[in-house]
């Protein structure tokens, strides 16, 4: 897709690298847009956008959709240079970074909502939840959702205002076109140190800092929530007498999502974080840097796709467990899991078929 006129601006080996990055970025961004759009469409058609369980995932998918569109636009603009490409690329990349940070925060927000949902299900089986507690949790959730949109925008205001006023976009697309190397806020060219150059340099490191710090905070928050959720899940296992099989299927689905969404988050952004750190420490012409560029193009643009896969797979597992649980309704009086374990323990060891029929779902 790259035009011959662009060859002059790229060093020999880097021209091939950026051409490969363009195709990788285009493909992964397209898949991410399709994946996030499918979750959004599913939530809308099921009329579940306002559901407390679906709303955080809807906003996370919306952020992934806009992020994928930014990646897609960058890949397309790489092969179709315009007269104001430097200005467009600079602001497109800054816009993309808003959605990077928003995606981090919405992932934390969704993981927290999953944990709260798990905790409320646990408490509801032990004691009745007061309406005040439910309203309080709902209010906190709305504040977190609004903050996840507002904070990234406010963080990037200096990049838009100071960067454009200081002409930091000059020669911005000279090397990499409009491919979104998300940690690469424009550095000034070889020129005497001026106030404008100092501002651009500050914006460069500010952009990297915002990305790395927001990722670190989000990652720590997710680890804390994950550890709390695992402890709560163990309490569920030890209190199986309170749960029927259909309830247990729901608990298992929520617990899986608490685990797999953070894993998808880390897989998507770990190469990009390493790339941002390397840009501050070593030359950007090293082979490690080149490898991370390719790995980043494969992972960072794919969060919408991975989130869609996680949601679809956990939903499939939930429906499968629920169907298995419903078989008791057609054959016998439904049993609690503790009752099934008791009856299973009283069966002789020589009856594997009967034992298999009374085993727990896990």
Feature roles, as predicted:
Residues 1-38:
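Extracellular N-terminal segment of 7TM GPCRs
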Residues 1-14, 156, 160-199:
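Extracellular/lumenal N-termini and interhelical loops of multi-pass eukaryotic membrane proteins
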Residues 2-4, 22-25, 66-83, 96, ...:
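Helix-to-loop junction signature of class
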Residues 17-22, 53, 58-127, 131-132:
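Extracellular TM2-ECL1-early TM3 structural module of rhodopsin-like
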Residues 47-52, 116-141, 223-256, 312-341:
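Intracellular signaling interfaces of 7-transmembrane GPCRs
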Residues 102-183:
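Fourth transmembrane helix
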Residues 107-119, 158-167, 205-242, 259-279, ...:
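Class A (rhodopsin-like) GPCR signature focused on the TM5-ICL3 interface and adjacent 7TM helical core
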Residues 256-277, 289-348:
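Seventh transmembrane helix
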């Amino acid at each position: 897709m790259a035009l011959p006129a662009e060859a002059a601006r790229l060093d020999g080996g880097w021209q091939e690298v950026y051409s490969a990055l363009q195709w990788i970025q285009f493909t992964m961004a397209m898949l991410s847009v399709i994946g996030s759009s499918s979750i959004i469409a599913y939530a809308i058609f099921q009329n579940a956008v306002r559901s407390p369980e679906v709303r955080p995932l809807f906003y996370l998918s919306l952020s992934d959709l806009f992020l994928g569109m930014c990646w897609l636009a960058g890949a397309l603009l790489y092969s179709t240079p315009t007269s104001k490409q430097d200005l467009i690329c600079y602001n497109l990349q800054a816009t993309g970074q808003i959605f990077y940070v928003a995606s981090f925060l919405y992932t934390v927000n969704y993981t927290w909502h999953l944990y709260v949902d798990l905790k409320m299900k646990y408490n509801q089986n032990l004691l009745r939840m007061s309406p005040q507690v439910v309203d309080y949790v709902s209010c906190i959730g709305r504040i977190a959702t609004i903050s996840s949109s507002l904070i990234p925008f406010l963080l990037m205001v200096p990049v838009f205002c100071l960067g454009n006023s200081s002409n930091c976009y000059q020669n911005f697309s000279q090397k990499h076109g409009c491919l979104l190397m998300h940690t690469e806020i424009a550095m000034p060219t070889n020129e005497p140190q001026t106030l404008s150059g100092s501002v651009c340099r500050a914006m460069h490191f500010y952009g990297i800092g915002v990305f790395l710090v927001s990722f670190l905070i989000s990652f720590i928050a997710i680890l804390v929530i994950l550890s709390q959720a695992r402890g709560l899940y163990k309490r569920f296992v030890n209190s199986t007498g309170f749960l029927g099989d259909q309830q247990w299927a729901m608990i298992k689905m929520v617990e899986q999502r608490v685990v797999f969404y953070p894993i998808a988050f880390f897989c998507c952004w770990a190469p990009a974080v390493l790339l941002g750190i390397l840009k501050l420490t070593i030359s950007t012409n090293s082979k490690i840097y080149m490898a991370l560029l390719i790995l980043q193009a494969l992972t960072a643009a794919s969060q919408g796709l991975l989130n869609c896969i996680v949601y679809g797979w956990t939903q499939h597992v939930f429906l499968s467990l629920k169907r298995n649980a419903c078989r008791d309704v057609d054959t016998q009086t439904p049993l609690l899991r503790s009752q099934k374990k008791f009856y299973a323990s009283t069966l002789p060891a020589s009856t594997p078929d009967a034992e298999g029929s009374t085993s727990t779902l896990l």
